[in-house]
Regions:
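Hydrophobic/aromatic end-of-helix segments at the C-terminal termini of transmembrane alpha-helices
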Residues: 35-44, 78
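Alpha-helical transmembrane segments of multi-pass membrane proteins
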Residues: 62-67, 126-153
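C-terminal transmembrane helical hairpin of 12-TM major facilitator-type secondary transporters
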Residues: 92-141
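Interhelical loop/hinge segments that connect adjacent transmembrane helices in multipass membrane
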Residues: 1-33, 216-223
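Interfacial/gating helices of multi-pass transporter permease domains
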Residues: 17-22, 41-65, 87, 127-134, ...
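Small-residue-rich hydrophobic transmembrane alpha-helices
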Residues: 56-109, 150-161, 165
């Protein structure tokens, strides 16, 4: 039986910092996902017909955001089952399949029977915007695949102990979110379209940023 190892105060502090440094970027991803509806609402509230646009924004994300968060849990899966060799795409295929299955949940709410009951009766959405609500939640079906793929690449970066790479992805998420809203709002685009576009663009920016940094030469990339 192995004896318990005694650590010095300095070793404990170093280990604690390493654990914090490892988990913070991953936790930040979930935090930004939860915070993004509020950030986007500041722009949607300044669009035409803002009352209706905000109603569409919040009522659809009430369904889409929890499912997207579930898809982002691909992070620990990627940490545990990271690629075993260059070109190993098994986890990528699994992430896409898992995201597609999760995407069936918001898709179901876009169907007339479920959508009319949930949004029209349960959430009391006005009839004038009911069709737009169902269209928006149908588009959000694809966000699950995007977040699952994002979670995979972030998990791989974490498994390689590249926290700065993961953090760069979170920065890309925030920049993508703000830039999309800043560009679309002055163009007079409907608020719900701004929201849907921003929520899709932001995780795509994260995925591209993390993937690009992981593929930089080690002499260029710092972890």
């Amino acid at each position: 039986m192995l004896e318990a190892k005694e650590f010095t105060a300095r070793e404990i502090a170093a280990l604690t910092w390493e654990q914090f440094h490892f988990t913070l970027p991953l936790s930040l991803g979930g935090f930004l996902l939860m915070l993004s509806p509020l950030i986007i609402a500041a722009f949607v509230g300044r669009s035409a017909d803002s009352t209706d646009m905000l109603a569409i924004h919040y009522v659809t994300l009430g369904v889409a955001n929890p499912v997207a968060y579930a898809a982002l849990r691909m992070q620990p899966v990627a940490i545990q089952f990271r690629p075993e060799y260059d070109g190993d795409r098994r986890l990528l295929a699994y992430a896409i399949a898992a995201g597609a299955v999760l995407g069936l949940i918001p898709f179901a709410f876009s169907l007339p029977c479920i959508g009319d009951w949930y949004f029209g009766h349960y959430q009391n959405v006005p009839p004038r915007i009911l069709d737009t609500v169902k269209l928006a939640i149908g588009i959000y079906s694809f966000i699950c695949i995007i977040h699952a793929v994002r979670g995979r690449i972030e998990g791989i970066a974490a498994a390689r102990k590249c926290p700065k790479t993961v953090m760069a992805g979170q920065i890309a998420y925030t920049v993508g979110l703000f830039c999309t809203c800043l560009v679309m709002l002055p163009l007079g685009i409907a608020g719900w379209k701004i929201a849907v576009t921003a929520i899709i663009v932001a995780p795509v920016c994260t995925t591209i940023a993390v993937y690009a940094m992981l593929n930089l030469p080690k002499s260029v990339r710092t972890t």
